[in-house]
Swiss-Prot record:
Gene designation: zipA
Compartments in which it is found: Cell inner membrane
Region (Disordered): 31-98
UniProt xrefs under Gene3D superfamilies: ZipA, C-terminal FtsZ-binding domain
Stated name of the protein: Cell division protein ZipA
SMART domains recorded: ZipA_C
UniProt family annotation: Belongs to the ZipA family.
UniProt-listed HAMAP family: ZipA
Species of provenance: Tolumonas auensis (strain DSM 9187 / NBRC 110442 / TA 4)
């Protein structure tokens, strides 16, 4: 009797193992059949996708964020908070589609002055930035920064950053602002004496038309004075030494903005 039970147990185990093996074999066979059916479709889809990429139909045109303002590497504590703002030209036109050549010649003609204005639109950025970096191996110390900001008329305010208003007493519109290069970019006035940072960034959002260039020149003067007070170095948005080429480019863009 005992021997029979042992035999039944062995047979049962073998039966279960056979069922499991059969199920696995069936499953693998179905997967291979499915892969054979879907492989041609996948290849065709891939070729179609590659064709679209070559023709440019899938391009979304979105560039890097620059604050807005041109800066995908891993986030570090000293990564700049302000990046770059992509430039978009309102004069850009979509590709001509079939059938659009039927538009009348009259509707395609524009006065020369209007076309000339169109060429200037969108050639400026939404935000202009001047970085002030500590010298290599050093930091900008909060106590020096606080002293310089007081001299230059900056006031701590919205978004927990410093702002330079039209009036030295903090009245009027904001001309430009200052943030910490260390994320999240804010300051704590009560901790300024113990703070140190690799750098700060001055940024100016576009003001009303006609005031862009004037505000930028004021920001440049403030940046130069601030760098002198904290023994810093002026850098552009690419974190290269501030050059006449960069300043000329900014001024030309703002002139176009002011005269649109």
């Amino acid at each position: 009797m005992q021997d029979l039970r042992i035999v039944l147990v062995i047979v049962g185990a073998l039966a279960i193992a056979a069922l499991v093996l059969h199920g696995l074999w069936t499953n693998q066979r179905n997967k291979r059949a499915q892969q054979k059916n879907t492989a041609p479709k996948a290849v065709a889809a891939k070729r179609s996708s590659e064709s679209r990429d070559v023709d440019g139909f899938d391009a979304d045109g979105i560039g890097k964020v620059r604050v807005v303002p041109r800066n995908g590497s891993p986030v570090r504590d000293n990564d700049p908070v302000i990046s770059s703002v992509p430039q978009f030209s309102a004069g850009d036109e979509d590709d001509v589609l079939p059938g659009q050549d039927a538009i009348s010649a009259e509707s395609q003609q524009e006065p020369f002055e209007e076309a000339q204005q169109e060429s200037f639109r969108g050639d400026w950025k939404d935000v202009y930035v001047i970085n002030i970096s500590a010298r290599e191996g050093s930091y900008i110390y909060g106590r020096d920064l606080k002293h310089a900001l007081r001299i230059l008329g900056f006031r701590f305010g919205e978004m927990d950053i410093y702002h330079r208003h039209l009036e030295m007493d903090g009245q009027g519109e904001v001309l430009f602002s200052l943030i910490n290069m260390v994320k999240p970019g804010t300051f704590e006035p009560s901790q300024m004496d113990r703070m140190m940072t690799p750098g700060v960034s001055l940024f100016m959002q576009l003001p009303g038309i006609g005031r862009g260039l004037a505000h930028f020149d004021l920001m440049l003067k403030a940046a130069d004075k601030l760098a002198s007070e904290v023994d810093g170095i002026l850098l552009d948005t690419s974190h290269q030494p501030l050059s006449e080429y960069y300043l000329t480019q900014c001024r030309d863009e703002l002139k176009a903005y002011d005269h649109q």
